[in-house]
Amino acid sequence: MSDSVIYKKIRETVQSNLPGSRVLLFGSRARGEEDRFSDYDLLVITPQTFTSSEKIYWSTRIDRALIDAIKIPVDLLINSEEEIRQKQELPGHIIRTAIREGIIL
């Protein structure tokens, strides 16, 4: 399966579960440093803020759907636009890294 097909499936899966969300690919695949064992590191940016338990629910649901669709594991972070604004300025925070190196899908 080509990258463009995989990216489309990721976008569609996230959008069908969390409409209005944006998806960033970051990590080794965004940097072009992946190997055959690399997962997909994804930051899902939502318009609304979710509780921790809601994030777990949505992460699990989307993760399962993506494993079924692309047969490759994903590492999924879900944060609201407000949470992104707060976290992206924190040195060493994974959100800062994801925003800096992320590719919009």
Model-predicted regions and their roles:
Residues 1-22, 30-36, 47-105:
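Catalytic core of pol beta-like nucleotidyltransferases
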Residues 41-45:
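Short beta-strand->loop micro-motif that forms the acidic, two-metal-ion catalytic signature
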